[in-house]
Amino acid sequence: WDTPWSYRLYKCLEQIQTEYVIFLMDDFILTDYVDQEEIEKDISYMENDKTIACFNYLPIPGEPEAIKYDRYMQMPKKTPFRINLQAALWRKSYLMKFIRKHENPWQFENWGSIRARRYSDKIYHLRKDAKRVFIYPDGGIIADERWHTEAAVELLKKEGYNIDFSARTIYHKGDARKTEIVHRTFIQKCWQVFKSLI
């Protein structure tokens, strides 16, 4: 596990032969059927417009620049978390272009959103009032190595999972998040930020 998360993701993507990939984190527990018809439509949109990088299947806060394909928003380039790790249909080559191999997931979302400002690739997010394509607890069921809210725990119990709270506690909104590797020196942190921005 010493290998950075984004390096492992990049190597995994290298082995996938398809032009498009559906990205789901391993703690996204689906609670309803997937809208396969919508995914197929989105693939056809991407085939007809090679500048579409991603259909992100979770709305993000902010005012859209435009509404596209009825149920998607095109957000301004400076929108925070315009690049994120929620359920999405990606053009594989574009996803690989956004990856920096030293980053953890939080850095990828933060710095990746800043990097994406340089590119003209189109990134669409589901409208807030649109039917969800993938239905799962927002943010997944794990947050910073803890159970992500009591609601996530209740979902697992409902599905028959026996939860050991001695091994993993519950994350509460407002708790500090462990998004940094604390043992790095100031110079190492600066170097990592530099690598993230190129």
Regions found by a protein language model. Name each.
Residues E19-I29:
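Short beta-strand-to-loop acidic/aromatic patch adjacent to the donor-nucleotide binding site
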Residues E65-P80:
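Short, flexible, basic/aromatic active-site loop/helix in glycosyltransferases
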Residues K157-I198:
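Membrane-proximal basic amphipathic "stem/tether" segments
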Residues I83-W147:
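Catalytic core and acceptor-binding pocket of nucleotide-sugar-dependent glycosyltransferases
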Residues Y33-P59:
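Conserved donor-nucleotide/metal-binding helix-loop-beta segment in metal-dependent transferases, i.e.
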Residues W1-T18:
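Active-site-proximal specificity loops/subdomain of glycosyltransferases
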Residues I22-F23, A53-L58, L89, I123-R127:
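A structural signal for short, well-ordered beta-strand segments and their strand-loop junctions
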